[in-house]
């Protein structure tokens, strides 16, 4: 790090080096210079369905912003195929496996490594592997919600041999964030026509749905037999892909929820002020129509005299 920083100053040119990190980030105290003005930070995420070859890529996020009225394509992914890609995840190594069974093991082994070693290695604090598993299982059950630390604590406390504090749960979650296992989604706070209290709690998500599936010990058939659970993991996969595509457009992904219960799963907001509203539904005509009604309701309360109207509304 420091040697490259010196070389960057010496050459005085852009785009010379690319540094990639491991699952456990380097200790900050070992770095003598922050790199401000020399380094740009880029979050590397698991592969999207387009990158893993499971999506045709016929509809791009940029097209939705630029020409939403000229969108048309047919999705060929069946329910069993979706269940498989949710459980397999976006891990490059999983694509190299010769069988589906071997591909599914990749996320399971990653989950074991997280709980047995990575969660302790991140800051050299010994953490209990079984407690880490309980917290990750609870987090998986609450993904897509604004579950508080107190909720997660109540969820795991019956299986805890001793009293656990909120601070302990928070420390485990912080460690999981540092090693890029979970990534909460911040709240979106638009200009509204009326004074409505907007909820500001983050929404819980795994960086990749396969880790949550592995935490609960589920497989593709389990998801197909429980569409409610499948829907939660499908949402996490969609959020993963939206984040990948939004990053490429220099955008961010948020969620919206107000005191009246009006909720929007994802808002992709670009730096130029353009944004799209997205409801995520696994399928079913009624659920899709419900999603469309929600998007229309949210669009109608946005004060377009103080901010842009949505570039698009999409049921994903």
Show the residue positions of the predicted features.
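Structural motif
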Residues: 274-276, 312
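Accessory nucleic acid-recognition modules appended to NTPase machines
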Residues: 95-274
């Amino acid at each position: 790090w420091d040697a490259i920083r010196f070389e960057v100053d010496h050459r005085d040119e852009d785009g010379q080096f690319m540094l990639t990190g491991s699952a456990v980030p380097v200790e900050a105290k070992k770095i003598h210079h922050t790199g401000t003005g020399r380094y740009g930070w880029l979050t590397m995420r698991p592969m999207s369905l387009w990158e893993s070859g499971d999506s045709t890529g016929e509809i791009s996020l940029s097209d939705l912003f630029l020409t939403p009225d000229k969108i048309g394509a047919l999705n060929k992914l069946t329910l069993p195929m979706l269940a498989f890609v949710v459980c397999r995840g976006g891990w490059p190594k999983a694509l190299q496996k010769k069988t589906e069974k071997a591909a599914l093991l990749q996320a399971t082994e990653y989950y074991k490594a997280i709980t047995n070693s990575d969660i302790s290695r991140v800051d050299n604090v010994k953490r209990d592997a079984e407690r880490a598993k309980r917290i990750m299982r609870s987090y998986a059950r609450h993904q897509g919600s604004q579950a508080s630390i107190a909720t997660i604590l109540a969820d795991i406390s019956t299986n805890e041999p001793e009293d656990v504090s909120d601070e302990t749960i928070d420390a485990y979650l912080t460690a999981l964030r540092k090693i890029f296992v979970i990534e909460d989604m911040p709240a979106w706070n638009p200009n509204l026509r009326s004074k409505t209290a907007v909820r500001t709690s983050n929404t819980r998500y795994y960086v990749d749905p396969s880790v949550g599936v592995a935490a609960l010990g589920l497989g593709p058939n389990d998801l197909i037999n429980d569409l409610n659970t499948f829907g939660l993991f499908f949402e996490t996969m969609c959020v993963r892909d939206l984040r990948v595509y939004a990053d490429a457009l220099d955008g961010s992904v948020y969620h919206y929820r107000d005191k009246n219960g009006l909720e929007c799963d994802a808002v992709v907001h670009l730096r130029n002020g353009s944004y799209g509203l997205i409801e995520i539904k696994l399928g079913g005509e009624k659920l899709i129509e419900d999603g469309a009604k929600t998007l229309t309701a949210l669009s109608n309360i946005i004060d377009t005299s103080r901010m842009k109207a949505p570039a698009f509304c999409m049921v994903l």
